[in-house]
């Protein structure tokens, strides 16, 4: 697969410079109790596609798949950056599990500077190290349960979940922020094969931690045979880039279409029982940073006839004046 020119993530925000992203303003205005939308690309009409892991939208858990060269790693990086642009670290945080050490965790740190939303990384560690990491995650769940119980007693609320707690924090009623916690696990198929107990416990953590703001996103190159009923029942959304065969696609989006994708970064997103299904092209976070006060947009006035997998069948130039 050859990478075609893709939309840079800054283009998605009409930003020629980092400052033009208006990140602080976004952090102040975006309400994580109502939505966790993050742009991930554009559809075949050039309209934005967003992933919203809010409980009442596409969330809380999901699957991402893509074979080598599909753009899966870039897609995950773009999604993480999109969340970071739109939500304060007090509202959204992340733990990255990069079992093969593919560089996902390192993409968000340069020297002593790192993305403030990343609260932990787990990479290239043995069984004992994985167990310690699991204990830390379980300890965080217990801490959240204690804080939620304290908030319930303070407010006489019948129940407290992550959305109610964050509203109490935003309103100044509770003092300690508790962000949504995304556990993003890349190459989970290999982790499941080599450390099955850890993987089972991680899925259990996600199930128990649902009301506590824990989200589990599992990514792999080869989903066929490793997406079992437990994983499938806990995954509300599936995103599939180019995969090797039809069964890989079926295991993620319940249809074989992603095996026929052609372009790097092209993907299908499927939510629930086909509540939402779309073909998209992801934004690209790997472009070199060239600051500009002028946002250059190339307007394509041609008409393209495409197949159901996004391949251009015919292109007609607009010659009308």
List each model region and its residues:
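Conserved small/polar residues in nucleotide/adenosyl-binding loops
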Residues: 2-12
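P-loop NTPase catalytic phosphate-binding loop
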Residues: 3-4, 18-159, 171-251, 259-260, ...
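Short glycine-rich, low-complexity/disordered patches
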Residues: 10-15, 320
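Disordered, acidic interdomain junction associated with two-component signaling
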Residues: 163-168
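Conserved C-terminal "switch" segment of AAA+ ATPases
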Residues: 255-275
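Long intrinsically disordered, low-complexity regions that are acidic and Ser/Thr-rich
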Residues: 306-309
